[in-house]
Amino acid sequence: MAELSFSMDINSIIPKGLNDENLTLDMIKAGQKVMQSSIKSAASRHRKTGSMANSVKCSKPVINRNGDAVGRVKFYGKDKNGMQNWYKAIWIEYGTKHQNAQPFVRPAIKGSESGIKSAMEQVFNEKVKWYKLI
C-alpha cells in the first residue's frame, strides 16, 4: 500500500570506503519504522476489531533491478471474518459508492515525512561516525 523508495548517486554523498549498500538498506529500514508507526496510529482510529491497525508491517528493504533501495509498509493478513486487511484499508481510504472516503494512509505518510527523513539521517550519521572511528 505505502512504498518508500529513493534513488541517488550514493558515491556523491558517502565518504570513500563507506560505500556499503547495507547503509542504504538500514536507512530505509529506519524510515519504514517511522512510516509504520504513523500509519498504524492513523489506522487505529478505524478500529472495530483492531486487526487492520495491527496488520501494518514492514517488508524487508531490498535493492531492486534499477538499483533503487525499496522498502514497503503494507497491510498484511485477514480479519476474523476472512476479509483482507489491505482491502478494508482501500475502502476506507478511497471510499465506495455507499461510503465516503476517509483518507488516513496518505495523510499519515505526508505527516511523517520529516520524521522519516530524520530517522534516515540519524542512521547515516551514526554509520559515518562509526566509520571515522576505525
Predicted regions and their residues:
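Short, cysteine-centered beta-strand-loop-beta hairpins and adjacent loop/turn segments enriched
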Residues: 79-89
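Short, Lys/Arg-rich flexible segments
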Residues: 1-72, 76, 89-134
